[in-house]
């Protein structure tokens, strides 16, 4: 979706991202073109970025993912990115949503992606963090007052319709429902909302299909932009 907006000459002044969205956000804010971000991931597998946990806090650890981020970003800290990025994670110790605007990028993005049970929580400066989507899966409000207009990009339906009865599958599906529920009020705060349908056949972990997912998002955004153009309206739904 970012690629379509990019081609339409629409560039953000600030970006808010959570979970997988925070990954794309920091790479884009670091100066990479959307298709370059796709290239980074399409040759990787889920196993390249994770390893089995030897503790009891989660099934997998994200040390390899943190190293991957650190190696492929040109800067270390959020405040050094070319475009400001707000990364949302969930403070597990205090039961609240936290919006990171500074500090180590890789650690904070890993925290935002640490789905409970599947991944070990991330410890940052003595506090444990898990996936930002637990409390805020569509973090619009964290930047709403700083923006004249906001475009929301939603790809959260990345979950298969069919699922097996394993403890992991059940947990992931339950999290998905919870994440969807807490995003409803945030979506209403967008001036333009673009959502990608047809992603129900993909898993969050199918990195080999990242190009297919990219194209679905690209086409969805282009369809919205084309429809607005045909109606002779701007992306803010005002007359041209």
Show where each model-derived region lies.
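Patatin-like phospholipase
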Residues: 1-18, 26-240
């Amino acid at each position: 979706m970012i690629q379509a907006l990019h081609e339409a000459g629409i560039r953000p002044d600030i970006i808010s991202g959570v979970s997988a969205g925070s990954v794309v956000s920091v790479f884009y804010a670091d100066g990479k073109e959307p298709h370059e971000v796709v290239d980074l991931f399409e040759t990787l597998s889920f196993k390249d970025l994770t390893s089995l946990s030897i503790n009891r806090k989660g099934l997998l650890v994200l040390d390899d993912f943190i190293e991957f981020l650190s190696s492929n970003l040109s800067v270390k800290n959020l405040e050094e990115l070319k475009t400001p990025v707000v990364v949302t994670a969930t403070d597990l110790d205090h039961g609240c949503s936290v919006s990171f605007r500074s500090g180590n990028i890789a650690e904070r993005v890993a925290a935002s992606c640490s789905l409970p049970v599947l991944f070990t929580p991330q410890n940052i400066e003595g506090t444990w963090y898990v996936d930002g989507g637990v409390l805020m899966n569509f973090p619009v409000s964290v930047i709403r007052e700083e923006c004249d207009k906001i475009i929301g990009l939603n790809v959260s339906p990345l979950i298969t319709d069919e699922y097996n009865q394993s403890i992991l599958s059940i947990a992931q599906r339950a999290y998905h429902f919870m994440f969807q529920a807490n995003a409803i009020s945030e979506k209403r705060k967008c001036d333009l909302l673009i959502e990608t349908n047809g992603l129900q056949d993909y898993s969050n972990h199918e990195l080999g299909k990242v190009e297919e997912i990219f194209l679905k998002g690209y086409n969805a955004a282009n369809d919205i932009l084309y429809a607005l153009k045909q109606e002779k309206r701007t992306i803010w739904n005002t007359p041209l």
